């Protein structure tokens, strides 16, 4: 891993090189509604509310979005979004949330999880509250640890080391989604979800947004680059004689290269 977060030069270069700092997608239940809302880097603050101004550069108004298949539950919930929320990034790449709505929002945030026992949770953020919901250094450390663990697993499998556990063998095939969760915030308006609610998943709530943060995604690309060049290795059964490898055809090699490619992030 040549990318060194400890050198602030790299952080500054990565952040300044980006035209956008986040992209926001709006959902009603499990349906994506409208177009992704892209926030320029120079707009340090973006507002997401329930009003109808379609022209705001740093204001995503959900009230003007139409959905011909809108559910009655969604119709009842949307007026209560009100003044919504405000997201702000600082010079260090951290992100802060302020709740302007009269109603609480319900948030999935790996950083807040780390402050509450490091277990996945749904965080209820009350009206008028303001707090940090994303920490760039924390996100980087988690993604780096995960990438190093995958690299170690692949090296052990490649070396055909005896006694590799099934967990270690499975670790080499960690998907991109497992990394990207450290680059994304998801929150629902008005209605809660999780173990304490009838709605267990955020996709069951009437109105919610997904915020993709571009600079941790850019860092993730750098972390995954060495893994792209190292195909996963199938575990060998050491109690059986190893079969000689058959020469690969060019067609098979192309197929494997496609499998090794990391899919791009969807907006």
Task: Give the positions of each predicted feature.
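Long, low-complexity, serine/threonine/proline-rich intrinsically disordered regulatory regions
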Residues: 1-78, 82, 120-267
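Forkhead-associated
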Residues: 76-79, 84-89, 93-127, 132
């Amino acid at each position: 891993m040549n990318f060194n977060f400890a050198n602030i030069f790299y952080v500054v270069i990565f952040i300044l090189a980006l035209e956008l700092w986040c992209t926001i997608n709006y959902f009603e239940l499990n349906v994506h509604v409208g177009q992704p809302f892209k926030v320029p880097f120079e707009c340090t603050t973006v507002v997401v509310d329930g009003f109808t101004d379609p022209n705001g550069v740093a204001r995503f108004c959900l009230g003007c979005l139409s959905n011909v298949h809108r559910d009655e539950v969604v119709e009842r919930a949307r007026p209560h979004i009100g003044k919504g929320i405000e997201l702000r990034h600082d010079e260090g790449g951290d992100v802060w949330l302020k709740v302007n709505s009269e109603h609480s929002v319900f948030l999935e945030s790996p950083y807040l999880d780390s402050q509450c026992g490091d277990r996945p949770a749904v965080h209820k953020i009350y009206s008028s509250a303001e707090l940090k919901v994303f920490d760039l250094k924390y996100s980087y450390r988690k993604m780096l640890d995960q990438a190093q663990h995958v690299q170690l697993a692949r090296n052990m499998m490649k070396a055909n080391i005896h006694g590799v556990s099934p967990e270690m063998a499975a670790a080499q095939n960690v998907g991109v989604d497992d990394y990207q969760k450290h680059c994304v915030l998801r929150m629902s308006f008005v209605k809660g979800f999780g173990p304490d609610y009838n709605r267990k998943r955020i996709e069951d709530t009437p109105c919610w947004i997904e915020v993709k943060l571009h600079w941790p995604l850019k860092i993730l690309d750098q972390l995954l680059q060495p893994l792209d060049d190292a195909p996963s290795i199938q575990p060998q059964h050491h109690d059986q004689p190893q079969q000689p490898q058959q020469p690969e055809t060019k067609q098979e090699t192309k197929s494997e290269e496609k499998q090794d490619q990391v899919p791009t992030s969807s907006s």
